[in-house]
């Protein structure tokens, strides 16, 4: 959300059009001073906002998001939820986010990273996009200072996924099962998630 509008005003000065999605009533009131046709304020929950309802064009998303809903927001923007009406991923070219430092490490992690960093969030984000860690931002950069460090990350959406998949929700289910119980072997993890034993064994052989 645009909050009090400090960053938003600078973006408005440089962009052709800015759509700001804000759910907080007080913030909505504080943003009334931005008066230009280039700025449109949307009073809504970002998790319930479909970009196709705003304008038939592509978007760049810039946000300093609440850290506790980072994963749901990314899932919504990248179309990772099982929702046939969610075409947000097709309308976004780039996402720039301020996130918790540990989340940033997970977003950019590859198979060579420590096991705690590489997982569901890493794979499903990088399946759709290239992720770049722009800068680590220390907690003392904010007032009041939070208890965690932050980082600025840039997510560039690819025109096509890295691998062609017919059923994205099935892929998500498989990846989630693989990382749900990291200390178990892969066969047991998939079987515990409800996958057919014979199919799992045959696939892994």
Labelled PLM ranges:
Residues 157, 175-205:
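C-terminal lobe and adjacent flexible extensions of AdoMet/dcAdoMet transferase-like proteins
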Residues 1-168, 173, 205:
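Catalytic cores of RNA-modifying enzymes
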């Amino acid at each position: 959300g645009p909050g009090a509008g400090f960053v938003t005003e600078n973006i408005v000065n440089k962009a052709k059009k800015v759509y700001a999605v804000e759910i907080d009533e007080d913030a909505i009131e504080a943003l009334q001073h931005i008066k230009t046709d280039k700025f449109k304020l949307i009073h809504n929950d970002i998790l319930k906002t479909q970009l196709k309802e705003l304008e038939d064009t592509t978007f760049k998303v810039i946000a300093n998001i609440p850290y506790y809903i980072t994963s749901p927001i990314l899932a919504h923007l990248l179309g990772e939820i099982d929702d046939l009406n969610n075409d947000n991923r097709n309308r976004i070219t780039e996402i720039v986010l301020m996130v918790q430092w540990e989340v940033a490490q997970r977003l950019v992690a590859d198979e060579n990273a420590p096991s705690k960093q590489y997982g569901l969030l890493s794979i499903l984000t990088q399946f759709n996009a290239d992720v770049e860690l722009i800068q680590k931002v220390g907690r003392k950069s904010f007032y009041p200072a939070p208890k965690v460090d932050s980082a600025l990350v840039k997510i560039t959406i690819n025109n096509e996924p890295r691998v062609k998949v017919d059923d994205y929700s099935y892929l998500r289910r498989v990846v989630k099962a693989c990382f749900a119980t990291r200390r178990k072997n892969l066969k047991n993890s998939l079987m515990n998630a409800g996958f057919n034993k014979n199919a799992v064994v045959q696939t892994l052989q």
